[in-house]
Curated annotation (Swiss-Prot):
Pfam families in alphabetical order: Glycos_transf_4, MraY_sig1
Disulfide bonds: none
Annotated localization: Cell membrane
EC number: 2.7.8.13
Function description: Catalyzes the initial step of the lipid cycle reactions in the biosynthesis of the cell wall peptidoglycan: transfers peptidoglycan precursor phospho-MurNAc-pentapeptide from UDP-MurNAc-pentapeptide onto the lipid carrier undecaprenyl phosphate, yielding undecaprenyl-pyrophosphoryl-MurNAc-pentapeptide, known as lipid I.
Pathway(s) of this molecule: Cell wall biogenesis; peptidoglycan biosynthesis
Enzyme type, top EC level: transferase
Transmembrane regions: 3-23, 52-72, 80-100, 120-140, 161-181, 197-217, 238-258, 262-282, 287-307, 341-361
This protein's UniProt keywords: Cell cycle, Cell division, Cell membrane, Cell shape, Cell wall biogenesis/degradation, Magnesium, Membrane, Metal-binding, Peptidoglycan synthesis, Transferase, Transmembrane, Transmembrane helix
Protein name: Phospho-N-acetylmuramoyl-pentapeptide-transferase
Organism: Corynebacterium diphtheriae (strain ATCC 700971 / NCTC 13129 / Biotype gravis)
Taxon lineage: Bacteria, Bacillati, Actinomycetota, Actinomycetes, Mycobacteriales
GO cellular component, as recorded: plasma membrane
């Protein structure tokens, strides 16, 4: 528990102190966000607000995880693990892809950033590497950081994605990992449209997964097979990483809350989407994350519905998508939308955590 608290505290402090440094640097260089002319008119006042603040989040997460790992090594209570390093690597890699996108927008004057093909190739390459490595590095119990089984509250024994001939099974599993990572990174990216919305919502998800993975650690099968125990490799390290993400998001939110002094940019949103996806795979709760991160799912779904409605029927289901803009254009103040969406995110996270805990109770008979 001490390591989790340290990770959260260090992540928060690093993020909250690094962010204003970025604000001053980017403001001095005139590196501000361009605002879509077809977006909500109230957003035009945000033109010129510094972006790429996700750098502070990534520094916060990395420093917090590293410091906690060093403390664990020194005290003999643990250290860096394959699971934690792989999820952190995924987060940083997607953050790097987002940084390239932001860099092109700001330094090269190309408003759309990376083209769709480059983003697709980048996400595909990162996903394939993560998917290949997640099934390696077994521990003494033979557990690898990830599993080829689809998972809800734990692995579903009857749903093994690596079915059929070995090559086919590997291809199916890697395709699933790509879809998962692409979906979550894009969903968080779409949610990052209002001051504080993505940072606050991600903090809620990270807080929930800090609790879930710590519970997996407390009831790990590695401590002796008992009813309801979890076959998850390195759950404590995952809890530490989630806590680091929680702290870093809260530190950034201090400056990103309305009126935002800086935006996280694709550097932050793609990275946080990767962190969400990576934690779901490593904790073997991919389907549960859909409930816990339901706000991100709804935001992404609103875009899909809007595009489908216009392409098939030439009608717009929402005033504007993602649907946080639908409510803005309906007269809600930006802060009202953000707070109410945080409430939705919190309720979804509570439902997901309750289902997780309820399943454990049903297996243990407590």
């Amino acid at each position: 528990m001490t390591q989790i608290i340290i990770a959260g505290a260090v992540g928060l402090l690093v993020s909250i102190f690094v962010t204003p440094v970025l604000i001053r640097r980017f403001s001095a260089e005139g590196l501000g966000q361009e605002i879509r002319e077809d977006g909500p008119k109230s957003h035009l006042r945000k033109r010129g607000t510094p972006t790429m603040g996700g750098i502070a989040i990534l520094i916060g997460i990395t420093v917090a995880y590293a410091v906690t790992g060093i403390v664990g090594q020194v005290t003999g209570t643990g250290g860096l693990t394959a699971s934690g390093l792989l999820v952190l690597g995924l987060t940083l890699a997607l953050g790097g892809l987002g940084f390239a996108d932001d860099f092109i927008k700001l330094y090269m004057g190309r408003n759309l950033g990376l083209n769709k093909k480059a983003k697709l190739i980048g996400q595909l390459a990162i996903s394939l590497i993560f998917g290949a490595l997640i099934l390696l590095f077994p521990n003494a119990d033979g557990l690898t950081p990830g599993s080829s089984h689809l998972s809800f509250l734990r692995d579903l024994p009857t749903v093994d994605l690596a079915i059929g001939p070995k090559a086919v099974g590997i291809a199916i599993f890697l395709l699933f990992i790509y879809i998962l990572i692409s979906a979550w990174s894009n969903a968080v990216n779409l949610t990052d449209g209002l001051d504080g919305l993505a940072a606050g919502s991600t903090a809620i998800v990270m807080g929930t997964y800090t609790v879930i993975t710590f519970w997996q650690f407390r009831n790990s099968c590695s401590a002796g097979a008992q009813p309801g125990c979890y076959d998850v490799r390195d759950p404590l390290d995952l809890a530490i990483l989630a806590a680091a993400g929680l702290g870093a998001c809260l530190g950034f939110l201090w400056w990103n809350a309305a009126p935002a002094k800086i935006f996280m940019g694709d550097t932050g949103s793609l990275a946080l989407g990767g962190l969400v996806a990576g934690l779901s795979v490593a904790s073997r709760t991919e389907l549960l994350m859909i409930i816990v991160g339901a706000l991100f799912v709804l935001e992404a779904a609103s875009v899909v519905i809007q595009v489908a409605g216009y392409r098939t029927k030439k009608i717009r289901i929402f005033r504007m998508a993602p649907f946080h803009h639908h409510f803005e254009n309906g007269g809600w103040a930006e802060t009202t939308v953000v707070i109410r969406f945080w409430l939705i995110a919190a309720v979804a996270a509570l439902i997901g955590a309750s289902i997780f805990y309820g399943e454990w109770l049903s297996l243990t008979g407590v």
